[in-house]
């Protein structure tokens, strides 16, 4: 596939053969940052221009580069580090006209930087920092030849893609083997094998260029040697088993005369050359390195940018190959970097000892954002700092729980420990000093971190935030919840009472307020639908009335830097009254068993629900007001009352102005009594906060018992709005999502997809039990998904409490025992724990706690999960065992196992655990199956508003059928996202998929294939090898592969092009689908239909029939509505049966086809007529076949019995389009396809092939 560099400027770049020609005039391997374009905007005073610059490296030939003048010079530095010819040189500066260029300035601001200028690369003297960076780059380059290490660190920025190991490029000369075409056994329909071994990425043969590179024990250089220019000493062991002692001096690297026990850093007499890089030195002293290094570079170049660029945020995989001692190579540089707890990976880049995260985050957050160019620079800077912060915090969390960081309060209980590391404040998710005692204790403290993060996200979405929030990230690791926050300047030097100038620090008893904060919070409250309200504060026995724009829990603090911060935003959204035991709820909620007991009292409605509820109430208000005024007009006309008719007409003319004012949240200025009366009636109907104007806002404190409200507050109306919003969730949002599941219009694949869909509708995860009750008695595909997620999340809650009480050295054995209790059969406590306990007691002479886990059995763990399900989700499980529950609801055990392991943050060995086999296993898991733990990370995800707006515009254009406009909007959004995020970002795959779909619809299929390929690789690396998104990307990729091959069909052999490149990804998609969910899913039906159609095309009828029947059976089993594609699948089944000689089965299938078409289109539609004609042909052929078989003679040829002409290839692509929901608008190449078919099927079929091509050009498919 082509390089990921095409992501930068896909709209403006000239496209040749599906590749960008914008980046280089040569076919160079650039960094992916060299052509970042930000779209023009009318408000920009300075238009971004594309400039051409010549780079003259210190080694190699000069090359030309095109880049936008708003880029940083640093991007050119990165380009040189990525190029094959210059990647080994790291210590240099860029000079323009003899003057050094600042790396952190924009290109347009550099004096003399014009189109066509030349930049010279000048090598600089080495320092210790430069030498360490150089060795890090050398290590990264040489790693491309090694097996990718998945075992350390547990949470890094390297992720792999399986798609890169699949050969998608068709070869004209290479013939397809039968083994390349037919599916492996584990992807056949009905196969019970769910081995994880196929999930991991196949590794290439190792290319070892050097055995080890290490810092010499003679470091640091003594004083006399420093004065002679020595910087660092390095020991290198080559593949020839020779050890070279190197000196890094200011001028470069050379071989010195030192030996193992002798220090002599002077230059060797045998090799007196000083090299600019270690790579160049090794190429001259090691023949093995000289031979292998070019192969490593070739392997590196073969990887596209999207395959090898690091991810912005830490990523982890839940499966890995077994850790074999032979594969864990010695790496001295790795040892130095990872065992030093104070190192976080950035200090080599930054001046000073530690980074001031808060200052960096706030400075970039406050950067100007008036113009599009300013927003691009601001968003890019803020995103980069935030990503660095999350990466640093992730390392800090692991070091804390490893015990490598000292608490700032070491004398207190471990649960109350707090830490400061690398200028980041860490706290554990426990109730410290009974702060949350009345709200639920530890459960409330745990939940408070999530709701606080939701508040931070909400404030980050404000159009012009005037308040500063803290950098924040949450980590769930080994059963602990750790919160990382940036530190407000001066906060540690003062008492909390002295710091807080707004809000309450004693849970509402005493409240303080500040007029300065009022001015800053007014806009925020307006956008977040928070109702300003007055509360009574008591101080020194005196009551005073204060105004709050937020909850009393929110605290305003002025830092020593003068910035005004707002924190503790856990009550930014209205409370969920359904989970407040004593709260008033609607009658509908009472009928459903609400309110009910919950572990804590901090449950809040989601921001998405608040926005959708307010929009629905606005629509109701407008409709009600208009209806009442028009009813009055009708009444006046019936009474023939001229005065009333005149007043009503005036009221109707004012109506549009009233609606505009309401939608813009302005005061309604009208003196018309009819309008006023209509507004009052509408306000009463929708339960507006005020009786004479439309106001739907929420007082987050209206159900808080700790705060005393002022007498002027109408608490009844305020509470009514909150109750209505909660009822809206039950009566509107949940029924809608359940119906979407039944109609298969929404198709989540795994628990993460399900959570994203629920959140988009404003439905909290705690309502899973309510959804489960509504789908448990249906045949919807969502039933096993929802119910298994309830079990998985309940298991997570139970296991988390166990892990917190488990010593670190027992985590492996406890985890394997817990998994055995859940997925195997364990009837007695762990014998391993008992043995270890006795051994430890004898050795230490004292009793040692072996943990709660040791007493677990299958029955006790399942009982705890059932109790947690009932308590937390309100879903009662009445089966005695997990196996019976899975069988009852058709849940695949491996899918549940995957969900549980991922949600726990456990990395396991990729092998076949045979969980779905009928044989009962006592212990499926051993200690060796547990490789590691990794943190589950939640954080505020910075986003670019401009890209979001362009995506919304593109989606709107798509809904109107304006494909070209939609394509341009999505392309522009991708350009902006690339400018801000770089190439790798979790939101990018979805945009690329949309762009690929639009490109295909517009006939730009090669580009569509390119976009979809990148989307698939990104999804694998950023979201997961087996995520639901990845499966969708694979399934989408297949179609563009087929269409690209279809276009070239007139030039190459059909089989050689089509089969290997399309079937392998399809088999991969089916394997992933089977592993993640199981077979009864609409997407599995789509995958099987694709496979069956392709296999039918190449006359593999027996195998094709299995997949086509599977697709048909799945659609019927899940109750998917009958539509065109089900009719087409049924028709293909009939044709496959006929091709196999089974005419009776063919007639049954085709009758069903005719029934579907008749139901969809009526009796006179062409498809119904064609089906009837085919039925007659089948009947005639069946009679002929039967006669020949009953009365055979010597002239009977079995091949002559099958006279049914298969459909032309173009018609099969028609079927694939419909299966995949693609609308075709004039695909280039169809005329060639029709011509090829004419030659293949003879002149008798010429007109039919032409008709098919014309139909494909013009028909709109469902």
From Swiss-Prot:
One GO MF term attached to the UniProt entry: mRNA binding
Biased composition (Polar residues): 31-40
Subcellular location: Cytoplasm
Tree of life domain: Eukaryota
One Pfam family named in its UniProt record: GSKIP_dom
Domain called Clu: residue spans: 335-580
CDD domains: CLU-central
Renumbered residue ranges of the record's region Disordered: 1-47
Gene3D superfamilies: Hypothetical protein (hspc210) (3.30.2280.10), Tetratricopeptide repeat domain (1.25.40.10)
GO cellular component: cytoplasm
GO BP terms, alphabetized: intracellular distribution of mitochondria; mitochondrion organization
Keywords: Cytoplasm
Keyword Protein biosynthesis applies: no
HAMAP family: CLU
PANTHER family given in the database record: CLUSTERED MITOCHONDRIA PROTEIN HOMOLOG (PTHR12601:SF6), EUKARYOTIC TRANSLATION INITIATION FACTOR 3 SUBUNIT EIF-3 (PTHR12601)
Function according to Swiss-Prot or TrEMBL: mRNA-binding protein involved in proper cytoplasmic distribution of mitochondria.
Family to which this protein belongs: Belongs to the CLU family.
Name of the molecule in the record: Clustered mitochondria protein homolog
